[in-house]
Amino acid sequence: MKRILITGAASGLGLALAKKYASEGWSVCIADIQDEEGIKVAAHLNEEYANDCFFQHLDITSDTQWRELVALISERWQGLDALINNAGVGASGDIDTFSIEDFQWTVDINLMGAVKGCHVCVPLLKESKGLLINVASMAGLLHMGSMSAYNVSKAGMVAFSEGLLSELDPYGVKVSVVCPTFFQSNLATRMRSDNPDAAKIAARLHAGTGITAESIATIVYNDSRIGKHCILAGTRFSDRTIWRLKRFLPASYLSMMKSNARIQFADKNPSYRERGIFERVLRSIRARIL
């Protein structure tokens, strides 16, 4: 029976991933800071699939807790076949008003939590020629203004994963990085921002997308098994188009991003006049989304 460790698996995408892998016959370690929910998830998976699933409290920013978890897994399972670094938080804010403490908090969880997990789990994955999956975001590829902390943490995850792809290839370890856009999740409940309405806006974006965490989990399961590195799970046609625009017409992409920033500025400063038709078109699109 294959063995997988998933961080942030008590809710959201992590929960969907835990259910998907358990349904495919994997033993799952549900690692999370949400003890009550995590215990319930493990009990449900064992009842539903009769696998060796268990919960372990894990603060992914703690080196000590990571080492203790790996020791527990080594004793219980005698190895590990896959690690999914899924746990994360949301963040938004302008660079001069978003606190340095919140910036550090975002990077510590979204990026350094995964780094610490890989540091202690990769030796087990080398032994099993296993699978490493890091959950980033479309924000790791497309960088909106007023989201510097989140962008940095997710772009760092993309770069980290790409480096590990070649580093771990000689050991037979497959590495994937997942870059979804908005999907139905509870990320908005775990975010910090300098805008009091940010959580409400984020929740509305996540809820209205029509893309479920379960559909993302299925894509991740299927694509990672065949060794796909960058998994654009759940991304809409518009997101893929913007990603292609950035890759092939970077100047046009940057002009579009600056126009979007001017719209955001106009929202905060009613006396500011938008410069042209491009801004008005973007505002119309944003109105339909928000």
Q: Where would I find each of the regions flagged by the language model?
A:
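Conserved glycine-rich cofactor-binding loop
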Residues: 10-11
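The beta1-alpha1 cofactor-binding region of Rossmann-like NAD(H)/NADP(H)-dependent oxidoreductases
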Residues: 35-36, 57-68, 100
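Active-site helix of classical SDR
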Residues: 118, 153
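SDR active-site lid
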Residues: 170-237
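Active-site loop immediately N-terminal to the catalytic Tyr-X3-Lys motif
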Residues: 96, 142-148, 152
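Substrate-binding pocket helix/loop in short-chain dehydrogenase/reductase
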Residues: 94-95, 99-105
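Residue(s) in the substrate-gating loop at a strand-loop-helix junction
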Residues: 137
